Amino acid sequence: MTQALQALIDQAWEDRTSLSPKSAPNDIREAVANVISQLDSGALRVAEKQGKDWIVNQWIKKAVLLSFRLEDNAPMSAGGFAQFYDKVPTKFANWSADDFAKAGFRVVPPAVARRGSFIAKNAVLMPSYVNIGAYVDEGTMVDTWATVGSCAQIGKNVHLSGGVGIGGVLEPLQANPVIIEDNCFIGARSEVVEGVIVEENSVISMGVYLGQSTKIYDRETGEIHYGRVPAGSVVVAGNLPSKDGKYSLYCAVIVKKVDAQTRAKTSLNDLLRGD
């Protein structure tokens, strides 16, 4: 079933310029709707960890992108909160009290999640935004005015602080989603975009900006990473001097490494303030 679905999505992607809400064949509509439904329930996800590596299911991401070519904008409500005009329904628009009880997570008004996103048990959505294709795992807090971009993968027991921006894959078009692994803390107003991976047990301080071109400097080893924060890193905003010493450019600095045991026992303030 999955292989046939993947083949149909891949072919539709090749023919995407010819697709429109009026011209799309029913089999393509049904295939895309099937994928979005399985993303919504958590049965499918855009990226999965296999061993130590993340594997991106590009065909699922293609289905998310195709969904925008198959629907016209239409008026819709977010649980009676307001009227909107969009292609993608909100996740909770038609949910009952039983649906919320079975799902087992909290949603604080006026949080919005789009249909096709998955929210796991014991997660908390403060007034925030979760886009289509995103996966928010168990016990994670999405704090006030944080945004989880399209197809982003957020692990277990993650804290996305107020105003955090997790980039998506739709605009601008990205090859891979942002991934925040288990037990990470992302400080207020930080941004993680362009498919950057923050590995497990890492702490990102307030106001750190991470993209594929951002230098991530390990002050203990002198090593520079791109696109990946190693597991157990404590990261703050910083600068590195130019080769001629005339100016400096923004970077992120790994000030120390901690293991999971230390991370669990030590307060965030101690980790960020300690030498």
Curated annotation (Swiss-Prot):
Q: Name one GO molecular function term.
A: nucleotidyltransferase activity
Keywords noted in UniProt? Acyltransferase, Amino-acid biosynthesis, Cytoplasm, Diaminopimelate biosynthesis, Lysine biosynthesis, Repeat, Transferase
Residues holding substrate: 106, 143
Identify the EC number(s).
2.3.1.117
Which GO BP terms sit in this record? Answer: diaminopimelate biosynthetic process; lysine biosynthetic process via diaminopimelate
Q: Which reaction is catalysed here?
A: (S)-2,3,4,5-tetrahydrodipicolinate + succinyl-CoA + H2O = (S)-2-succinylamino-6-oxoheptanedioate + CoA
**Metabolic or biological pathway:** Amino-acid biosynthesis; L-lysine biosynthesis via DAP pathway; LL-2,6-diaminopimelate from (S)-tetrahydrodipicolinate (succinylase route): step 1/3
The record's listing under Gene3D superfamilies reads: Hexapeptide repeat proteins, Tetrahydrodipicolinate-N-succinyltransferase, N-terminal domain
Does the UniProt entry include the keyword Cytoplasm? yes
Q: Where in the cell is it found?
A: Cytoplasm
Regarding protein family, the annotation reads: Belongs to the transferase hexapeptide repeat family.
Tell me, how does this one assemble? Homotrimer.
What is the protein name given in its UniProt record?
A: 2,3,4,5-tetrahydropyridine-2,6-dicarboxylate N-succinyltransferase
Gene name as annotated? dapD
